[in-house]
Amino acid sequence: MRNKAVALISGGLDSVLAARVVMEQGYEVTGLYFTSPFSKSYGSEELTPAVTVSRSIGTDLRVMDLGQPYIDLIRSPKHGYGKNINPCIDCKIHMLERAKVVMDEIGAPFVVTGEVLGQRPMSQRRDTLHIIERDAGLKGLILRPLSAALLPPTRAEQDGLIARDKLLGISGRSRTVQLQLAERFGIQGFSTPAGGCLLTDKNFAEKLRDLFHDQETITPHDIQLLTVGRHFRFDNGVKIVLGRNNRENHILMALAARGYHLFMPHGFPGPVALFSGTPDPEVMQAIGRLIITYSKQAPGQVRRIRFGSEIFDPGDPLPIQSMGLKKIGTKH
């Protein structure tokens, strides 16, 4: 029976290379790909790079949703945030805790990651790598094949389960060695570095901070809504989301079935608005004016708004601030 190992597979080059290097030593690798509402591909039916690269090296892949506990972690991470609202250290610890469960389940002696010493300023420093494996309950059990020659031997190396002289000593941000290895192993379809996490995006981070401030309980649906449209908030805390194009309008209309109120332009092209709260007359008028402000209809023409079975004239558009509204996010 072949020895088994568990590997975190992100879809990027480093993680699949790490798995492939371990496979060179005769291990059967089970890949783990974690999804969350903070992944740009979350909910997509298309093949992710993680699926593509796993197939290219011939390893099985388990897709695991990080779920509600991960959302709660993002709100208050023990080790803080990176440049935006990305808690990279806590994120890696959480994934490794989940990986440890699978490791124990299949009887694997270690977990493989594609971490490279010094590649990322927050989560891949020498001291941080130690903190991550300690807090994940995996001290001595995380094998980092790409940088192993520069790190203390793991338990697997000490016990002779892995040949240390066949592991690599890569460090820093250069990817020359990795690209050479990818060509050697015939690996294609990998994603760009750090390209799939919404938490590193400044615009998304501002919207998420606003949501954390406003709501105690946050669901994956709330997170997905942050990726769509222009976001505004009334002085009283109520939020509105406006579609920016036809695709986003259809997404917002689908979300309306989940307890949101939907306002639509009646008889003219323009954005739809999603709203949660009590639609009193003043709020309805402001939402209608906001829709008109962002519509392409020529000024002076009569424009009405549909809310359920009601059709009303909100009046002429006004400046955003004078309607008691604040823009949320950096892209409008």
Question: What does each model-found stretch correspond to?
Answer:
Residues 1-184, 328-332:
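ATP-dependent adenylation/nucleotidyltransferase module used to activate substrates
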Residues 141-332:
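AMP-forming adenylation/ATP pyrophosphatase catalytic core
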